[in-house]
Amino acid sequence: MPTPENLATDATVAIMLADGFEEVEALAVADVLYRAGVRSDLISVTDARHVTSSHGIRVVADLMLEDVDLSTYTVLFLPGGMPGTLGLKATPAIQVEALRRSDASQPIAAICAAPSILSELGILDGRQATANPAFVKAIAEGGAIVHENPVVVDEFITTSRGAGTALELGLELVRQLLGDQAAEEVSRGVVLAR
């Protein structure tokens, strides 16, 4: 994604894309981060920079997975969507990085179906979390303490429910990286009633 002209922070967010990703979840978060002055990169886990969303929208990723070191990003963000979530789950580098971040208490965010990836890795065991209603059972079976809030934060793990809560997730990431005032300014800018 183009770097905002005035970066507000050195923090960066890796937005992982597999074919079948949910475009609202990925791009709404990217948009909110951009407005706040946070650099985010759309990273393709496929064999091409063109990634097709779950609704047939083609997006050009900024980078290919093999060209980045995910550990250098402040936040690892996993959008949902089907079959995109399955594509992310099947990517060994994402599994390795999510587990590394869990062990190191470094930020991970996931929305919709993607929290199920964290659950299957054991990362949500005993943690507060949320997911798309169709995946609540899966994360509960993985030990998550499930909530229906739009966004749930448990230490360094942030989860959200779906496309309709993507702006709120983006604002929560802005709050974590830049503080309440920055999140409030972006919220007003996108005319999100809070």
Where are these regions (language model features)?
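Short, acidic/turn-prone active-site loops that include or flank metal/cofactor-
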Residues: 133-136
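Conserved catalytic-core motifs of GNAT/GCN5-like acyltransferases
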Residues: 151
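Catalytic, metal-anchored helix/loop core of enzyme active sites in primary metabolism
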Residues: 112
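Anionic-ligand binding patches
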Residues: 129
